[in-house]
Amino acid sequence: MSESATANANRETLGFQAEVKQLLQLMIHSLYSNKEIFLRELVSNASDACDKLRFEALNNSALYGDDSELKIRIAFDKDARTITISDNGIGLSRDEAVEHLGTIAKSGTKEFFSALTGDQAKDAHLIGQFGVGFYSSFIIADKVTVVSRRAGVEANQAVCWESGGEGDYTVEMVEKATRGTDVTLHLREGEDEFLGGWKLKSIIRKYSDHITLPIVMKKEDWKDGEQVMTEEDETVNQANALWVRSKSDITEEQYKEFYKHVAHDFEDPLAWTHARVEGKQEYTQLLYIPARAPFDLWDRNARHGIKLYVRRVFIMDDAEQLMPLYMRFVRGVVDSSDLPLNVSREILQQSKDIDGIRSGCTRKVLGMLEDLAENDKEKYAKFWEAFGSVLKEGVGEDHANKEKIAGLIRFSSTHNDTAEQNVSLADYIGRMKEGQEKIYFVTADTFNAAKNSPHLEIFRKKGIEVLLLSDRVDEWVVGHLTEFDGKHLQSVAKGGLDLGKLEDEAEKQEAEKAADDYKELLEKVKTSLGDKVKDVRVTYRLTDSPSCLVSDEHDPSGNLARLMKAAGQPMPNSKPILEINPQHPAVMRLKYEESRFDDWAALLFEQATLAEGGQLDDPAGFVKRINDLMMALSAK
């Protein structure tokens, strides 16, 4: 960050972090059509500042001084063309002002910028999701002044931060008589519509009615045919916690606006659940499922979305103990009646009360998803597209709810042969052929690799459905989900082919006869390939391909081995089994090949490796072999 002192020894001019400059430009252009959200964002920040003071004051009540009545004040000045949002919350020190207002100290910043598309509507959603907060001021202001004094410091230790939203800003130490923060917006030309009490109040009631603190403005009265400001305060919002109100008193619009506040999202939520739990533990939960995935969904260390309150006192923002990791997409509020007010993250980790709340919240979200899956398939398909891969993690992480989660999972399959994941395990079982005892699946690193796997040939021939698994997490799923509803899950690429009652006796006998006829060839191929394979055997799972690779029943699949290797994880050194199709012309030819036997054997192994999505140790050698064999064949 560049830094140069100005003539005023107390004032410094600092350069914005590069990402802030980029965000400001994006935001001013992408969000202009929705510019009134600046007030929602600044009120939300003011509310958070008061929550933080309340929390710190639990251990140090002196922070309140003689001002314990927390509130947010909004004022406007038509002559100066300014709007000021004030709070008496925790306030900012000089260093905090530089850190929070001059930089984006957020994980996922890089991912956020790489996700931007240039499409104004899509980028507006992403920017909102990233949390523009304070920077939304610049949508309507060409200069923003922030004066703040942190709770517990002297009046002369306040800070003034000021910027025109271009490349830099200034900070200087100033005097401020009271604790808290004043954000003053100097409006751009053409934004005078916001310099009126009615307009500001309507925005507050639309977006911030649920804020638990009073939002006050000076009352206006009619005098001589115009609105005149009085000295009397009026509270503009309802100023009580939305989640403690009766469900029948809350409109759908109010639920949606509260979600946007709590999740810092611009879009409406997909679904929500609101319940008061009584009995051994008492708490209220208001939990939302967003409509879209955040850009940092795959960061398992990213902030979680549940705010914890104790008896309506804010405790913490991202209480990860309240929701399992595989539900990190859930947003909302939990308000406990039983936890101590001085609860810390360490206490949360060891609290049986928290375990109970977590279990209750998890069951509630799973119930909401089951209801969507049953009664609103279109919404559930939206949910699955956004969060399905994350929900799959729960199969291995949440033993108590494993069956419920398994019932909610959706897969692609050979039933419709499209990449859309819309087949449940119950759907699959409902379509099983008479006599079929297992749920068959294949794993691969892409949908097309799964769909075109040679392992499917016999299944397609017999009309047996196979699940096509190509999400990275799918290997984890099938590693932990070995059966569903009494049916064993079986990889079509592991172990010997066992179709149970679906086997054709004549085919089986033919395969056994071929194994005898090809015994000598199998030994010869195994010797030629050396330590590349564990074994070579005849198969009848292939109808069109000459060969395929399978893993032993208890070895990791080839796809899992590749995933682990790519992640730098150690894997046991297991070798594949090469299976050959005795009906294929290439295999028949090999039986009588002498001069180029090793090349043909290597080719069978290499094309089987490629067909299952593997990589060759020596691609150049493979190409040379192909070319040599093509030349040899064309010369005949």
Swiss-Prot record:
* GO-annotated molecular function: ATP binding; ATP hydrolysis activity; ATP-dependent protein folding chaperone; unfolded protein binding
The UniProt entry, under InterPro entries, shows: HATPase_C_sf (IPR036890), Heat_shock_protein_90_CS (IPR019805), HSP90_C (IPR037196), Hsp90_fam (IPR001404), Hsp90_N (IPR020575), Ribosomal_Su5_D2-typ_SF (IPR020568)
The protein's matches in PROSITE patterns, at most eight in alphabetical order, are given as: HSP90
Q: Which GO terms describe its cellular component?
A: cytoplasm
Report the principal subcellular site.
Answer: cytoplasm
Which region ranges are annotated with the description B?
346-562
Q: Where does it live in the cell?
A: Cytoplasm
UniProt entry keywords in alphabetical sequence: ATP-binding, Chaperone, Cytoplasm, Nucleotide-binding, Stress response
Keyword Nucleotide-binding among record annotations: yes
Q: Where is this region: A?
A: 1-345
* Residue ranges of the region described as C: 563-636
Does the entry feature the keyword Disulfide bond, yes or no?
A: no
**Family per record:** Belongs to the heat shock protein 90 family.
Q: What does this protein do?
A: Molecular chaperone. Has ATPase activity.
Subunit and interaction comment: Homodimer.
Which NCBIfam families does this entry report, sorted A to Z? PRK05218.1 (NF003555)
Its name, as the record gives it, is: Chaperone protein HtpG
Please report the organism this UniProt entry assigns to the protein: Dechloromonas aromatica (strain RCB)
Which taxonomic lineage is given here? Bacteria, Pseudomonadati, Pseudomonadota, Betaproteobacteria, Rhodocyclales
* Gene behind the chain: htpG
